[in-house]
Design a protein with these regions (language model features):
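Glycine- and acidic-residue-biased ligand/ion/polar-headgroup-sensing regions
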Residues: 92-113
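Alpha-helical bundle regulatory/interaction domains
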Residues: 109-208
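Short acidic/polar alpha-helix capping motifs at helix-coil junctions
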Residues: 22-28, 49-51, 97-101, 120-122, ...
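N-terminal low-complexity or simple alpha-helical regulatory segments
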Residues: 2-94
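A sequence-composition feature that detects small, non-aromatic residues
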Residues: 22, 27, 45, 59, ...
Length: 208
């Protein structure tokens, strides 16, 4: 590159990075509501966004999240009034690569690959390699309660390198359905997150 090409490239990359909004703003734009700062159901160290009857025709409840350095923990806590069919991931790859959900309560299905979404099950997404025919379906008149942990790839691979584990074999194992041992491990973590009522900075220490 000559100096002019380099300056132009830096400008393009800077504009691209500026286009990726903060996760808080991403959630706010997607849900089309302001943060429910008075809702104390989950830890105040995170952020809670609520859907009431007038905000959505198909679901009512709340979404809570805590964002750390390289990871996001979130809780979906909704009553599904009408069948929900989700066929895209709304650019989640901008924020996390691997996203595992421990499902406390649900009645639905995930397609391509197929998996039933039922209580006490684990559902993992690789947002960097999600397929175009991805479909996520929740049936009407059901409660959807799930605790999820999403990691950026850089954080995962840094940790894998430190313990000498091959990333490809790790991802291959992680994305297999019906992992009883991993599901049981995440069940304990999920219940602790659901029951955490700590404020910052104690909650920051707990979530990290």
């Amino acid at each position: 590159y000559n100096s002019f090409e380099l300056i132009r490239l830096i400008g393009i990359l800077s504009k691209r990075d500026m286009c990726i909004m903060a996760y808080y703003d991403f959630v706010k734009e997607y849900m089309k509501v302001d943060e429910c700062k008075n809702n104390k159901k989950y830890s105040s160290a995170g952020h809670t966004f609520c859907w009431n009857k007038e905000d959505s025709t198909y679901a009512e409840g709340l979404y809570w999240f805590y964002e750390g350095d390289g990871f996001i923990i979130d809780i979906h806590d909704f009553y599904v009034k009408e069948e929900i069919v989700q066929n895209n991931t709304h650019s989640m790859a901008d924020y996390v690569s691997i996203y595992s959900s421990y499902i406390v309560s649900a009645n639905g299905e995930k397609f391509n690959p197929y998996q039933t979404l039922t209580p006490n099950s684990l559902c993992t997404f690789d947002f960097d390699n999600i397929k175009d025919d991805f479909v996520f379906l929740l049936h009407e008149n059901c409660c959807y309660l799930a605790v999820s942990i999403g990691f950026k790839k850089e954080l995962i691979e840094k940790h894998l390198a430190s313990i000498n584990i091959n990333p490809e074999s790790f991802y291959s194992s992680l994305l297999q359905p019906n992992q009883i041992i991993l599901t049981k491990s995440l069940e304990k973590v999920a219940l602790e997150i659901l029951n955490c009522k700590m404020d910052a900075p104690a909650a920051d220490f707990f979530f990290k």
